[in-house]
Curated annotation (Swiss-Prot):
Protein name: Chaperone protein DnaK
Keywords: ATP-binding, Chaperone, Nucleotide-binding, Phosphoprotein, Stress response
Claim: Nucleotide-binding is one of the keywords in the record: yes
Entry keyword annotation includes Disulfide bond: no
Residue positions, PTM Phosphothreonine: 197
Region of interest (Disordered), residue spans: 515-537, 575-622
PROSITE patterns in UniProt: HSP70_1, HSP70_2, HSP70_3
Domain of life: Bacteria
Family matches, as Pfam families: HSP70
Role: Acts as a chaperone.
Gene name in the database record: dnaK
Triggers of expression: By stress conditions e.g. heat shock.
Gene Ontology MF terms: ATP binding; ATP-dependent protein folding chaperone; unfolded protein binding
Length: 622
């Protein structure tokens, strides 16, 4: 059985890990780094870049460089978070089947397809590191991800060619990575602030059991929002000074984004930093430069409202768990944004105790995911994860009210039934609208999907008995069924989430991803062949020059023709590996023939040399 990899598919960076020989370890990417930027770029040459190479060229290619795609994963285009993303991100967000998608060079891509390209790179890096094929994976999601977002994440894994064994919550994975499952029974809080999402989870650990007591968060709050505060400040200051709005210039905006991200990182260890962006734009008077000094105090004043929101969520979740803060033994800090000093200070103040920062916050979630993979595979025994559903689930009933069937905080997997009836006399069908959220009315919650149960026999309202069953699996993904008890007629819907992707569409995307993988392989082989050909041309031309008059006219003509043919092929940017290698073979053969001829000439002894050799007597000399 092949190894199971654990993947933290992050908003800003992603990480992959594996459990081997009793421990979980992070797998470095081909560039030698432990984390890979969750960035995908489409170049004018038709190449698709992923990770560091994509991030490096973002400034010169902002509209076709995709980052923070996790922020629109599983979102409908009409949701507020989608509208916010459209205003913030430089690439073109559009819709497909009502769900968020992006448009690049006239082609529509879903967030699942973009995320799949990041996952494919992580998969390939893992295969190169382990020296074997990898298919099985455990992928983490923020604890507060809804059903649509979880399903979309699983689809991304499928498109990438992975068999997703489990979708688990990031804080739960972090608890495993810290080894907290092995300690005495105690209550802990995992505070997870990443690039685009925030979660706080209260867990109880002990006797090899990790049980989630309560969870909460914001799927649209993270380090990106800290960056955006800096971007807004820098753009506003520049506009006041020059009258130019940098937000209307996508290339300038991308430079601002990178500068803001770097400033945020520097202010984690320094009290002030300088932002210098020469030639950021130009007007009739000439080029303009942006230069600004930002102090840590100024930065903290920009983000204190966001940090306060996370502290408010801590109080809410600890209360949901039925605990007092004094009962919490450890506070585990997860996610790159927890490096911000203000975040650490406020969380420490909220609990009145030191924070647990013993594991790299960028890697801890992937490490935990690999441990969960080992649990599923059977390499790690006697560890039990008891996760919960982050939001209540129910259906729409008379008056547009949401009737909850599964309350938030219910341990999963779980299955619950509830019986309903008709609202009108002789009603022959009912529509089941499946909802997720905490509000009283359907319109204020997220609709996950709906289906009809038809063929109900005519009867006065309130008489038919319709049993609705909600079944949540270990991934937190929901299946809903409805059955008329009188006739036994039933209808089932596996909630596919907001992605709106059918099984056929997902399969087509899998094939498309494989096709691109094959295209990328061929392109890489052609580049390698081109490099070898350039070396061969240089080597043969050098040899011809050095040998000069020693080369016969016939040999020279043959070699020159083979050289010209190869050079002509290399001028074609689309030349395949096979075409290049065919011309290389011809050149190699004629140049080898030349070498043989030259060698034979050197070997042929002259008459004088032969005569001298005949006079030589073999003897030992004292």
């Amino acid at each position: 059985m092949s190894k199971v990899i654990g993947i933290d598919l992050g908003t800003t960076n992603s990480c992959v890990s594996v459990y081997e020989r009793g421990e979980s370890k992070v797998i470095p990417n081909k560039e030698g780094k432990n984390t890979t930027p969750s960035v995908v770029a489409f170049t004018d040459k038709g190449e698709i870049l992923v990770g560091d190479s994509a991030k490096r060229q973002a400034v010169t290619n902002p509209e076709k460089t995709i980052y923070s795609i996790k922020r629109i994963m599983g979102l409908m285009i009409n949701e507020d978070a989608a509208k916010e993303a459209k205003n913030r991100l430089p690439y073109h967000i559009t819709e497909r089947n009502g769900a968020c998608a992006i448009e690049i060079a006239g082609k529509i891509y879903t967030p699942q397809e973009i995320s799949a390209k990041v996952l494919m790179k992580l998969k390939e890096d893992a295969e190169a590191f382990l020296g074997e094929k990898v298919e099985d994976a455990v992928i983490t999601v923020p604890a507060y991800f809804n059903d649509a977002q979880r399903k979309a994440t699983k689809e991304a894994g499928t498109i990438a060619g992975l068999n997703v064994l489990r979708i688990i919550n990031e804080p739960t994975a972090a608890a495993l990575a810290y080894g907290l499952d092995k300690k005495e029974s105690e209550k802990i809080v995992v505070y997870d602030l990443g690039g685009g999402t925030f979660d706080v989870t209260v867990l109880e650990t002990g006797d090899n059991v990790v049980e989630v007591l309560a969870t909460g968060g914001n799927a649209f709050l993270g380090g990106d929002d800290f960056d955006n505060k800096l971007i807004d400040y820098l753009a506003s200051e520049f506009k006041d000074e020059t009258g130019i709005d940098l937000k209307n210039d996508v290339m300038a905006l991308q430079r601002l984004k990178e500068a803001a991200e770097n400033a945020k990182k520097e202010l984690s260890s320094a009290n002030e930093t300088n932002v210098n962006l020469p030639f950021i734009t130009a007007d009739a008077s000439g080029p303009k430069h942006l230069t600004k000094t930002i102090t840590r105090a100024k930065f903290e004043s920009m983000i204190d409202g966001l940090v306060a929101e996370t502290i408010s969520k801590i109080n809410e979740v600890v209360k949901d768990a039925g605990l007092d803060k004094s009962e919490v033994k450890e506070i585990v800090m997860v996610g790159g944004s927890t490096r911000v000093p203000l975040v650490q200070e406020e969380v420490k103040k909220a609990f009145g105790k030191d924070l647990n920062k013993s594991v790299n916050p960028d890697e801890v979630v992937a490490i935990g995911a690999a441990i969960q993979g080992a649990v599923i595979k059977g390499d790690v025994k006697d560890v039990l994860l008891l996760d919960v559903t982050p939001l209540s689930l129910g259906i729409e009933t008379l008056g547009g009210v949401m009737t909850k069937i599964i309350e938030k905080g219910t341990t999963i997997p779980t299955k619950k039934e509830q019986t309903f009836s008709t609202a009108e006399d002789n009603q022959s069908a009912v529509t089941i609208n499946v909802l997720q959220g905490e509000r009283e009315f359907s319109r204020d919650n997220k609709s996950l999907g709906n289906f009809n149960l038809e063929g109900i026999p005519p009867a006065p309202r309130g008489m038919p008995q319709i049993e609705v069953t909600f079944d949540i699996d270990a991934n937190g993904i929901l299946t809903v069924s409805a059955k008329d008890k009188a006739t036994g007629k039933a209808q089932e819907i596996k909630i596919t989430g907001s992605s709106g992707l059918s099984e056929e569409e997902i399969n087509n995307m899998v094939k498309d991803a494989e096709l691109h993988k094959e295209e990328d392989r061929k392109r890489k082989e052609a580049v390698e062949a081109r490099n070898s050909a350039d070396s061969l041309v240089h080597q043969v031309e050098k040899s011809l020059s050095e040998l000069g008059e020693k080369v016969s006219d016939e040999d020279k003509a043959n070699i020159q023709k083979a050289l010209d043919d190869l050079k002509e092929t290399l001028k074609n940017a689309n030349a395949s590996k096979e075409e290049i290698e065919s011309k290389m073979k011809t050149l190699s053969e004629v140049s080898h023939k030349l070498a043989e001829n030259m060698y034979k000439k050197d070997e042929k002894p002259s008459d004088d040399k032969k005569k001298k050799d005949d006079d030589v007597i073999d003897a030992e000399v004292e």
